[in-house]
Amino acid sequence: MAHVAEWKKKEVEELAKLIKSYPVIALVDVSSMPAYPLSQMRRLIRENGGLLRVSRNTLIELAIKKAAKELGKPELEKLVEYIDRGAGILVTNMNPFKLYKFLQQNRQPAPAKPGAVVPKDVVVPAGPTPLAPGPIVGQMQALGIPARIEKGKVTIQKDTTVLKAGEVITPELANILNALGIQPLEVGLDVLAVYEDGIVYTPDVLAIDEQEYIDMLQKAYMHAFNLAVNIAYPTPETIEAIIQKAFLNAKTVAIEAGYITKETIQDIIGRAFRAMLLLAQQLPEDVLDEKTKELLSAQAQVAVATQPSEEEKKEEEKTEEEEKEEEASEEEALAGLSALFG
């Protein structure tokens, strides 16, 4: 039987103890991180109540299996499937989604390397550069960067996108970007998988658009609120709106029935007055008294003054169409949320 070094046994024991001490265990790839950024990340993680431990992949695997067995949590052992590249163990009290967001927000820019894939579009900005005239001007122009010499310095004539997200950096472009001090790459801890409460989360699950979900939940809340009010389902959030709706409905019925109260008297009189004017419009002018004629004339002037122009009519039609489209999109969003939560 091969002899196992004592330090390896101790390392596995310490890693297993660490895993058992926290509710959230993440496997992260540290292989792309230089020493200084890695030390900064260790500090940030400690400040946020976690710990990062880098070790050999085989020892991490043994530690996970040991911890899973001792905790009686066989699902924890599924993490082993995601050990890859230069793995490290990150333990924390953050939930997996907050942890993923935290690591993404703390990625740092890095210099261009030939053969590397850029995570986002790379733009060379317009303006003067610190570069002196020389062969680099021709090299830039050959790569489609509009450069020329102005006042003894190399100047870029306009903002130029030299790489789209997902494209590979060529050696020639890497030289130019490094000369300009443009750092198109990012270094950080890449999440391989995160374990919490019997579930292993992968990066594709953790990379959610928070604002999109917030918008969906807000729309769902409004739809639920409106539904509850319309079916008179009382809750602390809806009771006031339900009472207001009931009051307005009762008031409308009372007005229609001509039932006089202090709340309805003005509306009933106003309704009768408008009915009187409508009837007066149908009668010959010679049977009307002067007061009624004055009222009809004033009503006609108000109608002319408030008549919308053709441009306003078009704008109203456009607004109505936009409202219909918005209602349709809200219905689609609600349907999507219903599908999401079953």
Curated annotation (Swiss-Prot):
Pfam entry (one): Ribosomal_L10
Keyword Ribosomal protein attributed: yes
Compositionally biased spans, kind Acidic residues: 318-333
One Gene Ontology cellular component annotation held by this UniProt entry: cytosolic large ribosomal subunit
Keyword Disulfide bond applies: no
Region of interest: Required for interaction with ribosomal protein L12 dimers: 212-342
Region described as Disordered: spans on this chain: 299-342
Gene3D superfamilies per the UniProt record, alphabetical: 3.30.70.1730, 3.90.105.20, 6.10.140.760
InterPro entries: Ribosomal_protein_uL10 (IPR050323), Ribosomal_uL10 (IPR001790), Ribosomal_uL10-like_insert (IPR040637), Ribosomal_uL10-like_insert_sf (IPR043164), Ribosomal_uL10-like_sf (IPR043141), Ribosomal_uL10_arc (IPR022909)
Function summary: Forms the large subunit's ribosomal stalk, playing a central role in the interaction of the ribosome with elongation factors; the stalk complex of P.horikoshii binds to E.coli large subunits and confers on them the ability to interact with eukaryotic elongation factors. Each succesive L12 dimer bound along the P0 spine increases the GTPase activity of elongation factors and increases translation by reconsituted ribosomes, although the first site is the most stimulatory.
Family in the record: Belongs to the universal ribosomal protein uL10 family.
Protein name: Large ribosomal subunit protein uL10
Species of origin: Pyrococcus horikoshii (strain ATCC 700860 / DSM 12428 / JCM 9974 / NBRC 100139 / OT-3)
Origin organism lineage: Archaea, Methanobacteriati, Methanobacteriota, Thermococci, Thermococcales
